[in-house]
Amino acid sequence: VSNGPASGQNDGARCANAPVVDEDSNIDFGDAPDSYLTLLASNGPRHELDGITWLGTTPPDADLDGYVTPQSDETVGVDDEWANGGIGFVTALEAGLDSKVVIEASTTGYLSAWIDWNQDGSFDGANEQVFTDYQLDAGENDLFLNVDINALTGTTWARFRFSQQTNLSYFGG
């Protein structure tokens, strides 16, 4: 017998472990395999959309959770993370050298970024945080990052977080 109150997201049944799903999410999540702590269940990176703060030319769309494959959240046809993501690697990433990155910011704010140099599926390795609370101006910003001397050759993942707050981690809200 169901005797709980019904709502727009609840049929009235009392389920102790029922997830709360906000179909009107105003939150943007990160995109990467979950070994990088991407999903909400893994305390994945997320921020509330403020209509002011983002990287690139297009404001991000809201997500219900993190996405673990490239472009997997683009079912609505808004390419906010990829083509207009605001991050351009101008020079090659070569171990032990500096690499130029152009970051386009919608407003002033703080950038923190990680690159999985050792390709172990996490961002917690030595020297994997490449920017920490780097203050960006609105528009294009030319930055240089040092590629770790022990960086492995091949495809890897990166996470860039831009916020009005400092001290952000590669995971968490």
Name each region found by the language model.
Residues 2-22:
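Blade-level signature of beta-propeller repeat domains, shared across WD40, Kelch, NHL, RCC1
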Residues 22-173:
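A broad "non-catalytic interaction surface" signal
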